[in-house]
Curated annotation (Swiss-Prot):
Binding site for Ca(2+) 2: 63, 65, 67, 69, 74
Keywords of this entry: Acetylation, Calcium, Cytoplasm, Metal-binding, Nucleus, Repeat, Secreted
Source domain of life: Eukaryota
Assembly and interaction partners: Homodimer. Interacts with PPFIBP1 in a calcium-dependent mode. Interacts with PGLYRP1; this complex acts as a chemoattractant that promotes lymphocyte movement. Interacts with MYH9; this interaction increases cell motility. Interacts with Annexin 2/ANXA2. Interacts with TP53; this interaction promotes TP53 degradation. Interacts with CCR5 and CXCR3. Interacts with FCGR3A; this interaction inhibits PKC-dependent phosphorylation of FCGR3A.
Subcellular compartments: Secreted; Nucleus; Cytoplasm
Positions bearing N6-acetyllysine: 35
Function: Calcium-binding protein that plays a role in various cellular processes including motility, angiogenesis, cell differentiation, apoptosis, and autophagy. Increases cell motility and invasiveness by interacting with non-muscle myosin heavy chain (NMMHC) IIA/MYH9. Mechanistically, promotes filament depolymerization and increases the amount of soluble myosin-IIA, resulting in the formation of stable protrusions facilitating chemotaxis. Also modulates the pro-apoptotic function of TP53 by binding to its C-terminal transactivation domain within the nucleus and reducing its protein levels.
SMART domains per the UniProt record, alphabetical: EFh, S_100
Induction and repression of expression: By nerve growth factor.
Species of the source: Rattus norvegicus (Rat)
Protein name per UniProt: Protein S100-A4
GO BP annotations, alphabetical order: positive regulation of canonical NF-kappaB signal transduction
Domain (EF-hand): residue spans on this chain: 12-47, 50-85
Gene Ontology cellular-component terms listed: cytosol; extracellular space; nucleoplasm; nucleus; perinuclear region of cytoplasm
Organism ancestry: Eukaryota, Metazoa, Chordata, Craniata, Vertebrata
Length: 101
């Protein structure tokens, strides 16, 4: 039986490959594929409307090697940044119950 972290890693990898290569390199997300992934898998991140300028800025920030696509490493950096932002948010929240030692 897979542990929760193993399952999370599987979801990260399988989600990338679900969208990558529909229109080209099967190991990269082009702009259309990335937008579809974010719209379907992270809808609260994009909000209800997609601001094209904001999306293009995100794409440019993720595309560290400037090939106009997002590879798996760039995708993981993006998810890591989101995870760190979530962690910082929850660090500021008071604990409801004291932590067990």
């Amino acid at each position: 039986m897979a542990r929760p972290l193993e399952e999370a890693l599987d979801v990260i990898v399988s989600t990338f490959h679900k969208y990558s290569g529909n229109e080209g390199d099967k190991f990269k997300l082009n702009k259309t594929e990335l937008k579809e992934l974010l719209t379907r898998e992270l809808p609260s991140f994009l909000g209800r409307r997609t601001d094209e300028a904001a999306f293009q800025k995100l794409m440019n920030n993720l595309d560290s090697n400037r090939d106009n696509e997002v590879d798996f490493q760039e995708y993981c950096v993006f998810l890591s940044c989101i995870a760190m932002m979530c962690n910082e948010f929850f660090e500021g929240c008071p604990d409801k119950e004291p932590r067990k030692k």
